[in-house]
């Protein structure tokens, strides 16, 4: 993706000042991809609040594996996000809530 000149891709890490996330950086962010594994509690509450505000303003958020237990995901979902595992052969359906968002281009209304 970094070869696509229409995209501006940046990274932010836990160890950077403010976890590498500021109002200024988020202002121009269309989609934030969040990956976290074990250090969820080390993410600053201020960072979580900044990201939540931008998501509520319309910024896209893609939370990757293990991010289900991140502070931002739990705050946005309003639950503790504890998971259990089961195998019942059930299907899960995902609905596109904002089909006009560029990240949804080419996707069916649900899958």
Predicted regions and their residues:
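Detector for Asparagine
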Residues: 3-4, 19, 30, 49, ...
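A general structural signal for well-ordered secondary-structure junctions
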Residues: 7-8, 32, 61, 82
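A generic short-segment signal for beta-strand/edge and adjacent turn/coil regions
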Residues: 1-4, 32-33, 63, 97-102
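Short conserved AdoMet
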Residues: 2, 56, 108
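An acidic, glycine-rich "communication" segment
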Residues: 64-111
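Aromatic-Pro/Gly-enriched surface loop or interdomain linker
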Residues: 1-29
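Short alpha-beta junction capping motif
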Residues: 25-71
């Amino acid at each position: 993706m970094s070869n696509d000149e229409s995209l501006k891709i940046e990274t932010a890490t836990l160890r950077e000042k403010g976890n590498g996330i500021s109002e200024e950086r988020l202002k121009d962010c269309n989609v934030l991809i969040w990956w976290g594994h074990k250090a969820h509690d080390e993410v600053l509450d201020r960072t979580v609040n900044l990201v939540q505000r931008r998501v509520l303003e319309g910024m896209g958020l893609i939370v990757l594996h293990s991010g289900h237990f991140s502070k931002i995901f739990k705050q946005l979902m309003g639950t503790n996000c504890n998971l259990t595992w089961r195998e019942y052969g059930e299907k899960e359906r995902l609905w596109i809530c904002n089909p006009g968002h560029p990240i949804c281009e080419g996707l069916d209304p649900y899958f």
